[in-house]
Amino acid sequence: MPWALAVLAAAGWFESTAGAQTPQIGLAPTAQQAAQIPVVPQARFVVLLDAAHGGSDAGASLANGQTEKSFTLALSVRLRSLLAARGIQVVTTRESDAAVDPNRRAEIANHALAQACLSLHASESGSGVHLFASSLSPAQPARFAAWKTAQAAWVTRSLALTGAINAALQQAGIHVTLSRTSLPVVDSMACPAVAVEIAPDHAAASQTVHSDLDDPEYLTRVAEALAAALIEWRTEAHPL
C-alpha cells in the first residue's frame, strides 16, 4: 500500500469503491487480519452475510431459550446454502460462535467487494421482518471516504436493494416493516447494505403458517425469500 493510503487508513479513511471501474479498498488490515480476509474475484457477483453478535455477545433472548446469535448464524448458514446452489459466491463475517468486532465486520464486507450486504438480526418484538437502511444522507462517490460514513455513497443503491427484499418477502406472505436508522456496521459498509431483523410474524399467527422464531419452517421461508430477492438483484442490477 502506498504511504499516503496507509496514513489515510490510520486516520479512519479508505479509498472508496463507489463508481469505480476497478475498485480498490485502501484500508490496511494487520498481517494477521489480511490472512483471514477472503480473496474474491472481482468479476463474480458476491453477497456478504453478517450474522450479528457471537461469542460472549448473545444478542437478544428469543423464545425457548434461543439466542439471537444462534438464530442469525443458522439463518446465515441456510441462506448461504441457497445462494451457493444458484452459483452466487457468499462471504460471511462469521461461521461459528465467535465474537467479531463491528469494524472487522465492515472490513470484511469492504474487502470482499460485495454487490449486496445483509446484516442479519432477530428479535421477539415487532412482527415479521424489519428492514433497516442507513439513515445517512446520500453522497456523491469520492475517491476517499470516511470509514464511519462510507455507506453514504451507497445509500441510493441500498434503498433499491431494500425494495427488492421487501417485494420478495411480501410475495412470500411475510409482513415487512421499512425503516432507516444509524447502525455502525452498515454505515461503514461500502456496498449496497441492509440490516434484516426477523421477528415472529404475528400477522400470520391466525393462519396455517409457521411464524415463530424457533420454527425451522419459518426460518426456511425467510431464507428462501431473501435468496429470491438476491437472485433477482443479481439478474436485474448486476447480471453476470
PLM segments and residue spans:
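Generic alpha-helix initiation/capping and coil-helix boundary signal
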Residues: 2-4, 45, 102
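Bacterial N-terminal signal peptides
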Residues: 2-12
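Cleavable N-terminal signal peptides
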Residues: 7, 17-18
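Active-site-proximal helix/loop segments of hydrolytic enzymes
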Residues: 23-32, 36-38, 70-240
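N-terminal hydrophobic or amphipathic helices/low-complexity stretches enriched
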Residues: 34-48
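Short glycine-rich His-centered loop
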Residues: 44-65
